[in-house]
């Protein structure tokens, strides 16, 4: 009976809400304690807020109030994830995730970070938090967002540090090099030297290098100070290659990380993939620059981005932010536009620590007692009852960082830039929101200490640029590509790469710049830790080719490039198979007619992708998955094209025989997976990403959180990435009213709202929505106005 009454109340409440927000031109006035003056919040047809205030305090207050009104439960879940407090709601199911976050200790880090913020930054965070709390104060048991009522709890007051800790989630999503260090050690131990050396060679003929140059690919140099020498150094220090149990523990820990980040939309595959590019006016149809950006993160409902237009005497800015974070993270102001993609440098190091029987850890100064802190996690005993019981864990912290792996008598500690309380990204975005030119753009980024990013730039005067920003460590010895011996000083961080030494471009002769997580600097760059871990070059190369051919770029042609699904490596492989007659007549005919695009109805795309995976596994001699993955991503394309004898597996006379074997195995695998009817063997069956709410699978109640079931297609090697384009921006400096900005679903986190998924159709089809900016365009778009008054 209780659930029936609750359901009826919800239906009535949401029906009333729908009527209120649908009245065209409605004006509403609300008294809110904490404001210094009146604030105007206007909304357009997509409920995108346009907020104007007489001072920055009230602007951030109103932004917090507005975002909380649309995404309060999402905000609460993000801070709970980063603080390790989800088991209080979900019980044992997420306890391991909470333990991981508690070991990382970000709650303590952000508390310490506040002392390093300038007064205006602290005021912005405090004003935003006050606005969130003012909205929370308006809620009662009937008006709480539905997720709170289902889970039977109420939101705690928002704190300024809650906004800061969301930045730590992003850092976690964009940094996983510690596990790569272990995998590299495994690769070197398990592969013949010639194979490992070729895998360790970072160069690829499809690379899009923006800074510096490469030694010619035809003459591979001997590695200097990289994996081989570092491994020899490690062994001389008594560090053995990570054993299978250590690697298994690392994989489990990374799986916990993936589950945790995916639940709130922050997990990203393929080294946190994203695309951005900028085109100068000399290559555009109207003579003005165009900037594009589409970050790739996990599909979730609601999406991780929230659109905001903010205006005060110090700025006018529009774009997206994370719910819970003041200001705009990616977007534009009156003068400049900016976008970002992940760089992927090595900002994490593992240290094999030596402990004695007394629990002390070995250091260069002798045996020392590590810091040990106790963390208490409240764990819900029953999903239908909010009562909890405490679970305590002890976290050991050495001088290098917290111990995150303890297996087989070995303990590994993690050092990470995100653990430094001085490293925050909020100050940089605060500056970007107000920057007027290239120099002010660089000044803002010079203080950026978050996950390293490729920031692209365009301004209303026609200038374009690119600058890497982030804290990238310098080591006393080696480059951090393998675990260090924690008892020595070899892994000591001696500083960070200076901002003016980070790769950058300003108005390059080419007239455009593209980054897609590729290796952006040549092998002549002095800091190898910046260019060692990166995504494959395929997306960057495809975008480079499209932009090179587009002499008169438009918003429409840029949008088409964002939606492009041509797959370079699979197209190359299909041609090689056809040329060698390396498959059955049916397969050869199918591949010969393929256009190289990962269309959802493509049979060829599905089959050749399956064949590629088979080839990689056989080249790795069907051994552990790590070598197979490295082979597929690093050298398979070249090995097949050049018929490299080094990579031809034993038992095969030549590559044609290898291709035929993989064709047979792939067809058999697809028959088992999809049935004998080949008409249903289409790429859309394998690649579709779907948006889902964290509660969508809950019995009885999950259906109300359903999102569109349409598949979202692409692949990891195409500009239109399958998993997952989290938003699309096309900014047009000098003509801001033609800027396009679209998120996957909608502004509201309320599944009953008309704005829960009203942007999906535009997002799915690539027809991005115009985002008005001028006062005249905004005025014409407004359908509802709310005035907040003190």
For each feature predicted by the language model, list its residue ranges.
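Proteins synthesized as precursors that undergo proteolytic processing into mature forms
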Residues: 96, 107-108, 129-130, 427-453, ...
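Glycine- and hydrophobic-rich flexible loops that cap the catalytic core of alpha/beta enzyme folds
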Residues: 271, 312-322, 331-335, 340-487
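Bacterial N-terminal signal peptides that target proteins for export
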Residues: 2-12
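A terminal-accessory region detector
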Residues: 479, 586-674
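Hydrophobic alpha-helical segments
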Residues: 410, 447-550, 612-617
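Terminal end segments
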Residues: 529-584, 662-790
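Substrate-recognition/specificity elements adjacent to catalytic centers across diverse enzyme folds
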Residues: 27-290, 295, 301, 398
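Bacterial N-terminal signal peptides
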Residues: 11-22
